[in-house]
Amino acid sequence: MTKFKHLLALAALLLAAGAAQAERLKDIASIQGVRTNQLIGYGLVVGLSGSGDQTTQTPFTLQTFNNMLAQFGIKVPANVGNVQLKNVAAVSVHADLPPFAKPGQPIDVTVSSIGNAKSLRGGSLLMTPLKGIDGQVYAVAQGNLVVGGFDAEGRDGSKITVNVPSAGRIPAGATVERAVPSGFDQGNSLTLNLNRPDFTTAKRIVDRINELLGPGVAHAVDGGSVRVSAPLDPNQRVDYLSILENLDVQPGEAVAKVIINSRTGTIVIGQNVKVSPAAVTHGSLTVSITEDPIVSQPGAFSNGQTAVVPRSRVNAEEETKPMFKFGPGTTLDDIVRAVNQVGAAPSDLMAILEALKQAGALQADLIVI
């Protein structure tokens, strides 16, 4: 224990003295087992101003409402006709349970309509248990919703909707009831998982930790994980990780990628994208058809009839654009400059990049989303 205390003190001094233009370890890696868990539940939102579910179309809302009343000893007679609960909506409730969350701590929840409720604005969520993937209840949610959107409709059928009124949030709307075991304090080692697996980054993390704490403290498991020795005492382990997560590590260069969103026309070109020698030209053919009818007017007293003679004009024009050439080692700046010079639109640039990839001149992964 004393050895680890001395080692941590020395590491803190070396860490404070070193200066590097790099990323913190906490920003490029996470600790295995320390993670967020998703919770989900089903409940009712009440207090809506006539914008709730139409129970004739969403029978599960009425069933849920009757089940809730039964828990309070209230039984709805079976001979009652269709009950219209315009102020009630069936909703799904989900939340993220952060690591190390303890019973009694509040967490935010998101509430979304399941039925055909027009708006959840002004509603209150009744007590809803939130379960994990194992079926255990980890939190209980309840409270007033904060809805950013709104919906308004006139008698003549005119309607306006701003944002999404059928979903909202409850800040600190759930209370944690059960903690999730993390395994953080078990074993004599910890595993760091890289957010973006890379062999170069993994090697640099190992070298940086061993340089600071001594050889053999860290070793790479693969391109996405690094295992480090850790003290058994929980207090020392926290001190140990507080030093590791603030280490400066220079990540490896990302794989060259070009991302194309064909729906929005967005194109993102990575910094390391290069193009082999190639010549590119991209023209467009425009075909226009115009109707120019001629009116035939007969002479006076000729007993003729006025007639319209159709006449169509078809014109084809091909826009010529200069050819631009990519030399060896062309970078992102060169590509952007060349494309701007010819005035290519996003759709034109997509076609050019796809053609360069097919020709084997684009040295990058082309990803269409």
Curated annotation (Swiss-Prot):
* Designated name of the protein: Flagellar P-ring protein
GO term, biological process aspect, one: bacterial-type flagellum-dependent cell motility
As for family, the record states: Belongs to the FlgI family.
Top-rank taxon: Bacteria
Signal peptide positions on this chain: 1-22
The record's disulfide annotation reads none
Q: Could you tell me which Pfam families the record lists for this protein?
A: FlgI
**GO CC annotation:** bacterial-type flagellum basal body, distal rod, P ring; outer membrane-bounded periplasmic space
Read off the PANTHER family from this record: FLAGELLAR P-RING PERIPLASMIC PROTEIN FLGI, FLAGELLAR P-RING PROTEIN
Keywords for this protein: Bacterial flagellum, Periplasm, Signal
What NCBIfam families does the record point to? PRK05303.1
**Compartment annotation:** Periplasm; Bacterial flagellum basal body
Q: Which GO terms describe its molecular function?
A: structural molecule activity
- Major location, coarse class? periplasm
Subunit info? Answer: The basal body constitutes a major portion of the flagellar organelle and consists of four rings (L,P,S, and M) mounted on a central rod.
Q: What does this protein do?
A: Assembles around the rod to form the L-ring and probably protects the motor/basal body from shearing forces during rotation.
